[in-house]
Amino acid sequence: MIYMRDILMRVDNMETNLKVYCEAVIEVRNEETGEIETYRQRNLVTDYGLTKILQSVTGIDTTIISRCAIGTGSTPTDWSDVLLDNQDGSRKQRVETEMVTSFGGGAAGKKVWIKTFFNRTEHNVVWREMGMFTTGIGADCCSRIVLTTPINKTSDYTITVTWSYIIVSS
């Protein structure tokens, strides 16, 4: 299932339709063998996440989406999600952006990504869900994913999560 949300912006009788979607790339590295498994999954932008994006565009709020949280819950995602089912913790990371020239069909857009590294001692539980937050401690989930393949994180593994928000004009 692909989760994509539409935002309609009107300025002086001009109209631009924007599409917003998220993708997570999860690299699981076995530190004993060097073997890397990569998982890629599209995920849900919540209503709160859309509000944050629009508040950032208009300058109403300067709080940024910068925390990746891990959880063990498995309840399906919903537009109204503001928390993970069972959060184990979160990490704050640097946010980077790049201009994406084309997403097919000639649509130009902007991509923001947050790359988070979890070392061998962090969050050694079965990862079933992840989310992106502004503070990581409250009801401020901007996007959430329930992993199609749960990850059994132990001290043998490090994990790098690259979470992308992609906004394109349509």
Range-by-range predicted roles:
Residues 1-128, 135-170:
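Small cysteine-rich, disulfide-bonded extracellular modules of the LU/uPAR three-finger superfamily
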